[in-house]
Regions:
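Terminal low-complexity/intrinsically disordered segments and their adjoining alpha-helical capping regions
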Residues: 1-136
Length: 136
């Protein structure tokens, strides 16, 4: 669905199918074309990345594989040091992090609603277990 906004994707593929691609745990949307891939990989923001590591399509399961090591190696370390952390990321990365932190099942994640642009605050124990969460 690279390059399509949600409304255009719904018109082309149907609302239910787009919902499944956007929200399910292990269903990938259609892979991007070589032309689409070349266009966004030409963007200088991606120059530092190994192009072979960039997927043609990605499910939430795939995103989780990328997000959790970053949580473990970086974010959690700052929190364990007593620092406050602000995470600003793409919705699917946030969804993966929420799935991990709240232990949301693969089946339940499809209906999990995340407000766009609204700060979500987590209160955690010293062991980084969720005590509470709320939107500002």
């Amino acid at each position: 669905m690279q390059g399509l906004n949600k409304d255009d994707a719904r018109k082309e593929f149907g609302e239910e199918q787009v919902h499944i691609w956007r929200r399910s745990y292990d269903v990938k949307p259609p892979a991007e074309t070589e032309e689409q891939r070349e266009a966004y990989l030409a963007d200088r923001r991606y120059n530092h990345l190994d192009k072979r590591m960039m997927p043609y399509s990605e499910s939430l399961k795939d995103t989780l594989v990328r997000v959790i090591p970053f949580w473990t190696d970086h974010i959690s370390q700052y929190l364990l040091d007593g620092q406050t952390v602000l995470v600003s990321a793409h919705g699917n990365s946030i969804r993966a992090l929420i799935k991990y932190l709240e232990d949301v099942s693969d089946e339940d994640i499809i209906n999990y609603e995340i407000k766009t642009g609204a700060p979500l605050v987590y209160e955690l124990t010293d062991d980084l277990e969720v005590i509470d969460k709320y939107y500002l």
